Amino acid sequence: MLTRCLKIGIVCPYSWDTPGGVQNHIRDLAEFLISAGHEVSVLAPAADDENLPSYVVNAGKPIAIPYNGAVARVLFGPVAFSRVRQWIANGDFDLLHLHEPAIPSISLLACWAADGPMIGTFHAASKRQKIIFAIGPILEPAIEKLSARIAVSEAARLTLTDHLDTDAVVIPNGIFASHYSQGTPQPQWQGNTIGFIGRYEEPRKGLSVLLEALPMIARFAPDVKVVVAGPGDPSEVQKSIDPQLRHRFTFLGKISEQDKANFMSSIAIYVAPNTGGESFGIILAEALAGGACVVASDIPAFDDLLGHGEFGALFVSEDSTDLAKVVIDLLRDQDK
């Protein structure tokens, strides 16, 4: 049993000030390790230092690149490499934990720069990631430096084995379940309310599938409401909503962690209509912890997390009619 305090460095590849499952996982892991008595420093890109936790070191301003069906905000290049080396030297870490070290990011730079014990956690799930194939020859020596490799799901593990001919132990992302189970229900989000959280402007998040399903759902439940949280400009989305149904939508923008817990404790159904590119689905675990019924597309990661339908309802990915049917069945059951 480990009893001494460790100096642990964690590298986050994605911009800290952009909401995302990887960032949330790293935040929770860092705070858990700190609470256990360890000294933790997280290196992450960020637009500025405002609102960064005390344990996060800003590696520099990220740039946006298309990646895995979305837009990733990462940092790479010689200036970033210099900052990574300086952070490693100053930290004198017992252990480094690198997230997504197989993409051009500060995690890969840290893997190149560091020696000693290193763990790599792989989050991405995709049938074919061109960027990994393209830089495979320079990735493999770096990945071989890792003392241990973790995949957050079987889908992420298969992506790793397919692209880099190496394997990993599957350890799912953890959450502070009590944070969500102790959320305070909010009257404005109760009733026949469907919730959605995410970067809804990204097509793979699947909000358009929910929009297409809503007219069918509304015919069964005339009082149904949809509450959408997350960064983005709702004006374009609102144009695609049936004018007779626009009043049913509320766009909250980016919300705090406490508001997210209250949100999950209030809504009737959380819908995750993502069309692909997800390796775990931490938001589903948060919704379940908050007591919401979960309806998710049947992409592999969501299917695994929901126990093939045991812990939540699944619908055929990108099929708005099937989504409507599943939601209506749930609302009908809640009325009994």
Locations of regions flagged by a protein language model:
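Nucleotide-activated donor-binding/catalytic signature segment of Leloir-type glycosyltransferases, i.e.
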Residues: 237-259
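Glycosyltransferase donor-sugar binding loop
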Residues: 46-48, 197, 225-238, 253
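N-terminal strand-loop element at the rim of the active site
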Residues: 5, 12-19, 26-27, 31-79, ...
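Carbohydrate-associated surface elements
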Residues: 155, 174
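Conserved donor-binding/catalytic core segment of Leloir-type glycosyltransferases
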Residues: 186-205, 211-215, 227
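Conserved acidic donor-binding segment of nucleotide-sugar-dependent glycosyltransferases
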Residues: 308-309, 313-320, 329-335
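Short hydrophobic beta-strand element within catalytic cores of glycosyltransferases
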Residues: 269, 293-296
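Membrane-proximal helix-turn-helix segments that form the acceptor-binding/catalytic region
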Residues: 126, 132-149, 162-163
